[in-house]
């Protein structure tokens, strides 16, 4: 696998403490605020007119929860991310035509949210391990493009 045993331990140790539903909504919300062009995929979600509207939007929260639960499932298959995300890759790439760069942006936003939630515990070693994971997931999701 692309993660060492130690890195897997760091990732799983922190992930066990993550409130997946809450963090998912926050990460997707921040993506839409920080990178406004990503909003075009979410036009059916209602009010995205301001940061407050986005962060409070129940559809954004619900989809964020879904996204992070999928990410969570992916962590259980960390040595076969391409397999774990094959169906989602097909949906997002073939059917929704999402630019794979957006998966990378969301991964980086997720890292920011985790740093914000966990403070000192999200030390450089933990961050390095998570950056590898989000890059791996983004690559797996972009797999259909290659």
Curated annotation (Swiss-Prot):
Heme b binds at residues 63, 92. The modification N6-acetyllysine is found at residues 59, 82, 144. The modification Phosphoserine is found at residue 44. The modification S-nitrosocysteine is found at residue 93. GO terms for cellular component: blood microparticle; haptoglobin-hemoglobin complex; hemoglobin complex. Keywords: Acetylation, Heme, Iron, Metal-binding, Oxygen transport, Phosphoprotein, S-nitrosylation, Transport. One of its GO terms (molecular function) is hemoglobin alpha binding. GO terms for biological process: hydrogen peroxide catabolic process. It comes from the Eukaryota. Involved in oxygen transport from the lung to the various peripheral tissues. PANTHER family: HEMOGLOBIN FAMILY MEMBER (PTHR11442), HEMOGLOBIN SUBUNIT BETA (PTHR11442:SF42). This is Hemoglobin subunit beta. It comes from Lynx lynx.
């Amino acid at each position: 696998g692309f993660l060492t045993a130690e890195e897997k331990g760091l990732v799983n140790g922190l992930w066990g403490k993550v409130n997946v539903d809450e963090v998912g909504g926050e990460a997707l919300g921040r993506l839409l605020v920080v990178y406004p062009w990503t909003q075009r995929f979410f036009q059916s979600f209602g009010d995205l007119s301001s940061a407050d509207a986005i962060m409070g939007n129940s559809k954004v929260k619900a989809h964020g929860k879904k996204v992070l639960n999928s990410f969570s499932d992916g962590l259980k298959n960390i040595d076969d991310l391409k397999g774990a995300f094959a169906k989602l890759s097909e949906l997002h790439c073939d059917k929704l035509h999402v630019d794979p760069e957006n998966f990378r942006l969301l991964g980086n936003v997720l890292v920011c949210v985790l740093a914000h939630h966990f403070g000192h515990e999200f030390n450089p070693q933990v961050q390095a391990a998570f950056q590898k994971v989000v890059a791996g997931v983004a690559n797996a999701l972009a797999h259909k493009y290659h």
